[in-house]
């Protein structure tokens, strides 16, 4: 879907579903249809949040910009939204190949220059959720501008498109210290999006 209007900044952890995994495995590639970002945003996240049962508050947050100052690790840990394949039990704790590129508090390892360790548990701070939100938006934008339908309607359809800029609307009275944190989150999101785009993910 392409949204032409503003949408909610809700963030929900959810496994990307592309149909029956068994069909992909038969091709010899268990991860042929893997989406590397662990979160959904906007209307999709709102639908997921509305259907949450039994794990409220553990699968995502609304308006992560409000929590830019909160760098504390999440004590209970984050869980994927939704139900397991049996339709009864809740989805497991957040995990996946993406955790090799962030710390347990959700900091992008590329921002720390070798001073951090890959996450073992998903205890990401609420501040880091802004990084995950921007990462998902960046990857969705790159995916859309490179979609066959989009490229075929423009000149040089065979040339891959590059995302040059993203414009965010923020309050003019935003404190300088908060602007600095937001800028760090944006830089981390860019590095994560690039890492996700060029890495080959295993079955994770």
PLM regions: where:
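Hydrophobic, small-residue-rich alpha-helical packing segments that form membrane-like cores
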Residues: 184-204
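Phosphate-binding loop and its immediate beta->loop->alpha context
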Residues: 1-166, 170-172, 176-178, 183-184
């Amino acid at each position: 879907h392409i949204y032409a209007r503003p949408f909610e900044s809700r963030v929900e952890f959810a496994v990307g579903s592309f149909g029956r995994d068994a069909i992909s495995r038969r091709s010899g590639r268990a991860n042929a249809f893997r989406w590397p970002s662990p979160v959904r945003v906007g209307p999709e996240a709102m639908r997921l949040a509305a259907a949450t049962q039994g794990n409220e508050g553990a699968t995502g947050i609304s308006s992560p910009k409000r929590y830019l100052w909160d760098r504390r690790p999440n004590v209970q840990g984050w869980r994927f939204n939704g139900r397991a394949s049996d339709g009864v039990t809740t989805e497991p704790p957040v995990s996946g190949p993406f955790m090799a590129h962030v710390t347990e508090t959700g900091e992008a390892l590329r921002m720390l220059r070798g001073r951090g360790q890959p996450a073992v548990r998903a205890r990401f701070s609420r501040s880091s959720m802004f990084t995950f939100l921007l990462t998902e938006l960046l990857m969705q934008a790159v995916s859309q501008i490179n979609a066959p339908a989009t490229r075929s309607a423009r000149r040089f359809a065979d040339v891959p498109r590059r995302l040059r800029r993203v414009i965010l609307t923020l309050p003019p009275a935003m404190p300088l210290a908060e602007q600095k944190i937001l800028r760090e989150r944006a830089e981390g999101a860019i590095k994560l999006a690039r890492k996700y785009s060029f890495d080959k993910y295993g079955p994770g």
